[in-house]
Amino acid sequence: MLYLLTLLLSFSACGGAKSTENAVSNIETIGNESCIKDYMTKYDKLLPLEVIKIHYDLPANAKMKYNYRPEAKRHDQDTYEFTWDSGRKRKMKFGGQEMEYPSPNRIGLRWVGSDLFMIQGKPTPLENFRGFYRNASAAEKEAAFKQASEKLIEKGYDGKTVETATSLGKDLSADEIIFKNIDGLGEAAVWRIKEKELTVLVGKTSFQVSVEISENDEENIALAKKLAQEVLNKCK
């Protein structure tokens, strides 16, 4: 189901005019793709606890969780986070019903080395990234979900599964603004508003810094930018 939602949501963001931006050539000044990939099996070395503490005083009850996938080809979907209770709750519409769930504080890394955004099929990594992480209009979303549903059926998924995935995908992408462009990091960067994750493009790959320490998103973004810069500094 996660794969289906990813595909559906990627289609919902890919409409609109094609970008004419050129890829940045001098990537050594803003991050090194090869170096980033070298850390795909050691997220905790790419952003170690002592570096996080330079920018944020983690409480004693913060717990580290490293979700390490055994399959080598899936390390770009690993997660490494420090979490602790916040007392906050978030609301989410899921399958037509509104649900409330705990929203703990968290700081860490996700999806280091991911190139999922390249499924856009555009000429350059930057164009793919901008096409994948963009705010689509309601009309674009509806057309994209229709196209994605047809492709899922072509791949052999049954109608009920496609209907469920489409419904969930529409719920998750219901807000008009779900991405916020962030300047000055990597070749491009975007804040994923719902997920509280800063995704940074480096060459043909990316990494995500997850930060949720406040209801004020500007505080979350400010810390995420500092931690992302630490990653880029390590991989100059």
Question: What function would you assign to each model-found segment?
Answer:
Residues 1-7:
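Sec-dependent signal peptide recognition
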Residues 10-13:
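C-terminal motif of bacterial Sec signal peptides marking the signal peptidase cleavage site
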Residues 15-18:
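Bacterial signal peptide processing site
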Residues 47-48, 52, 227:
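Generic structural signal for hydrophobic residues
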Residues 151, 155-236:
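A short, solvent-exposed beta-edge/loop patch
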